[in-house]
A protein has these predicted regions:
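Conserved class I S-adenosyl-L-methionine
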Residues: 17-27, 121-144
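Conserved SAM-binding loop of SAM-dependent methyltransferases across substrates and taxa
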Residues: 28-39
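Conserved SAM/SAH-binding beta-strand->alpha-helix loop
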Residues: 48-50
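Conserved SAM-binding strand-loop segment of SAM-dependent methyltransferases
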Residues: 61-72
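A short acidic, Gly/Pro-enriched loop at the edge of an enzyme's catalytic core
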Residues: 76-84
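A short glycine-rich, Lys/Arg-flanked "PGG" loop and its adjoining helix->strand segment in the class I
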Residues: 101-119
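Short alpha-helix
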Residues: 155-173
Length: 175
């Protein structure tokens, strides 16, 4: 959560100074600083007050950053953004989003914060990654073959294949 290398996930992306970014699940700010360097305005939302405080101290010199603490599902930001960044959060949506379709509901909410030309950037482990077929434990549960076997009995975390993500995205109202 503290390595500067984590910023590599987005430091290559062509975000411009004229862009606004909504970062969901900012954590301790591993990519927040990079987003602030690239975009004109960054709003970071974090569920944990402790992590939000770490993010603040890590990025306190950034004058284009607003940090908010709470569940985005309970917030109305009253603004739309050029980018919504969801990095390492979607897999936990059933923990903080109510209803029978938490992933679709969560992504639908993210879509409501995008401008008409805005982009949703999602980073999540690939449920069908080769390492899992080779016996590596699932990243969140530390149980081998757990994800590729459909997370039997698990109701707190879930990753997806590309095809599954595309279906969730479509059901959420994205093209």
């Amino acid at each position: 959560h503290f390595s500067d290398l984590r910023a590599n996930i987005l430091n290559w992306y062509p975000i411009k100074k004229s862009d606004s970014v909504l970062e969901i699940g900012a954590g301790c700010g591993a990519i927040t600083g990079t987003l602030c360097e690239k975009a004109g305005q960054v709003t970071s939302v974090e569920l944990s007050k402790r992590r939000a405080q770490i993010n603040y101290y890590r990025n306190e010199k950034k004058n284009n950053l607003t940090i908010m603490v709470g569940n985005l599902n309970d917030m109305d930001l009253g603004q739309q953004y050029d980018y919504v960044v969801v990095n390492g959060v979607l897999e936990y949506a059933m923990s903080f989003t109510e209803g029978d379709t938490p992933y679709e509901t969560f992504l639908g909410k993210m879509g409501s914060y995008l401008k008409n030309t805005g982009k949703l950037l999602i980073a999540i482990e690939n449920k069908l990654g080769m390492k899992y077929f080779a016996g590596a434990p699932e990243d969140h549960t530390d149980i081998p073959f757990f994800g590729i076997n459909g997370y039997p009995g698990n109701h707190s975390v879930r990753t997806f294949s590309k095809t599954e993500l595309q279906k969730i995205k479509k059901k959420s109202g994205f093209p």
